[in-house]
Structures are given as C-alpha cells and as structure tokens.
Amino acid sequence: MILKGFVFVAEGVDMSQLDIVKRSSLHSIHVELNASMIEESRWERPNWYINPDTEMAQITATVGICDISPVGKLLVEGDKLDGFCNKIGYKSSVKWGDVVPHSLSEGKMVLCRLSANQLLVVTSAENIDPVTNAITPELTGCLHLTDLTSLYTGILVCGPQSRGLLETLTNIDLRESIFPNMSCVQGRVADVHCTVIRNDRKSMTAYEIYVTRDFGQYLWTGMSERGSDLGLLPFGVEVLGRLIS
C-alpha cells in the first residue's frame, strides 16, 4: 500500500499537462536572503546567495547549510524489511542505524534503517517516481510505503565545523566513534524531533537533517543564529552540485 498526499483538481483536467512548481517551507527565507532562484525537477530552489565561490570557500573553512527538501524521502514500514531489501537487489541486511548506497536501473538511492520496522529510502528528486514504481511491487504482506517528500523539510549541514554546530543544538552523541559516516538516527535537534543522516561530502563532515515541514523555518533559523559566530553561510544548488561531483 502506498500513502501519498493529494492535490485536488477539477474533473477532466489532465494532470500531465499541469506545470506545478513546488516550494519548500524555507522559500520565504531564501527570498529574504535575495537568493538567485532556479527551477530544478519542478522545484523552485536557490542557486546561490552571495556567489558560489564564496559559499564553497566558507563550507571548506567552517560550515554551511543548504535546503535539500526536494530529495525523495520514501518511508517503508512493516515487518520483514530485510526480505524487502533482498527483493530490491540489496543482498545483505541493513542494520539498525546503518546507511547504505544502493542502485537500481531506475536510479540511485540510499537505504537508511531507522528502526526494526522502518526503512527510509532517500533518492534524488528526479528519481522519485521511477524508484517508487520499481520498489512498489515488493511491498508484500504488511509492508507499506509513505512518500514524505513534500511533508518534510531537509537541511544539509556541511563543513569541518558542522559537528560542532550541531552539538550545540542536540544531545545526540555525534562523536566519530559513535556516529561515523553512513549512520542514521532519530532524535531531537533544537528540541524538535528529526531524522539525522551522516553522509559526508568530498571528505567533509556532513549531516542531512529531516524535520516535518511546519518546523523547517524554526530549525533553519536556529542553526543560522547558532552558527553566526562560525561565519556560517547558506549555499545553493550550484555548490551542492560541486559537493556531489
């Protein structure tokens, strides 16, 4: 069973002809910061704020934050998740707290084992539909999938000072020995329940933080204020691409 949000349109309207551009819960903040906006995968996103080179330099030196809300967030819940992973081509079990990369012909993804009965599948915005279609046939028994993409805000915190910044906002143990690269956990950041995924970029410590949409601005603002002494800057899609390539 797949649970998704719905957009209601008039009867007879061809949905394929609708040009719907989505915005994250942080859109008004990006506008206030005079971000240069672009459309990517039907999302309006900040391409850059000051300029990409300055933003990249700041991340390399200290820390930066980026709105990654458009990434696909597919939550699979139920028993026998190990069997589900096997059916979609991942032959080992994904242990609680582990994050593992996986690929299908439909697209790349990471599998994040949040609990015994919860697996978060994270993929790129353009691969949400093909990945969903590929894994849906394997939702047997009591397994079901919920598309959280538009319901959750995503914030990437990246740079050598990212751990230090987050440690001022959470009691999650982020020490390297406890929470190494490719780990995930659910806990509280700025006193808000979040999912935290450690997924480093270009050898720089990086955390993906996902929170329900209604707390997105609160979390972004809290991080920005707490990181001001570190020279924290927001960065956009241009720099995000450099961190991936």
Where are these regions (language model features)?
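Basic, glycine/lysine-rich polyanion-binding surfaces/domains
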Residues: I2-S245
